[in-house]
Amino acid sequence: MQVRFIFNLYQNDELFFGYNGHMTMNPIEQHRFNMIEQQIRTWEVLDPEVLNLLHQVPREKFVPTEYQGVAFADTEIPLYDDVCMLSPKLEARLIQSLSLQKKDHVLVVGSGSGYLTALTASLVKNVVSVDINPYFTKLAKQNCQKIKLNNITFVTGDGSLGWLKNQPYDAILFAGSLPLLPESIRNQLNVNGRLLAILGEAPSMQATLITRSSNSDFEEEVLFETVVPSLYIKHENTFVF
């Protein structure tokens, strides 16, 4: 007789065990558990809701077949055309830093494979996810549909200046780095809205949180330093998202 292993790892930091007192976990769940314990918790991601989310949203379903062996590794994963998934610990840190709420209307710029969008959508009311490449719009939508997320609007378009059509937003998340943040994007936030972007150029980039404290005032906080691929590819003095 087998007893299914049912657990909620991080609500109270307790583990639940099978009838014989031994923890039963398949290899994928073991890798996921190790990712959370060894990479993510040690990088100052301690919010129980975020940690539970990382267990519930199956990262491996957003990883290309040829990279399944490193789906939970502390590394960026190539997708297509110089675009990659961010490392698990960075994705988790970004989500935690936005302090997302169930009522939030959120913009994600850079759909990629859809994983960061899926994490966001699992915590909020609805998400608009924008990517200039129709390949990623289709891929992200398919991946999110597989796990039955239905509160996401996927759009193909240039998100370099945000996305005016569905503004204002309670939160805006850029899934890659920007050399500079256009000032106009801030105005797409609601009052008390948060914007998180990694700003700068290698080797010096900073994860920066901007909060709209009033109609005319914004607060800016540098959270940490990192280096990630840019959302922009430069061609003949223009930036293409």
What annotation goes with each model-predicted range?
Residues Q2, F16-Y19, V155, S160:
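Intrinsically disordered, low-complexity segments enriched in small/polar residues
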Residues F7, N12-T24:
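Short, Lys/Arg-enriched N-terminal segments with co-localized hydrophobic residues
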Residues M23-L107, L119, L123, K138, ...:
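Class I SAM-dependent transferase core
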Residues T208-S213, E220-F241:
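Substrate-binding/catalytic lobe of Class I Rossmann-like enzymes that use SAM or dcSAM, i.e.
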Residues I6-F7, F62, N126, G159:
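Alpha-helical interaction segments
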Residues M1-V3, S99:
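Short intrinsically disordered, low-complexity coil segments enriched in acidic
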Residues S99-E219:
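Conserved nucleotide-cofactor-binding alpha/beta core module
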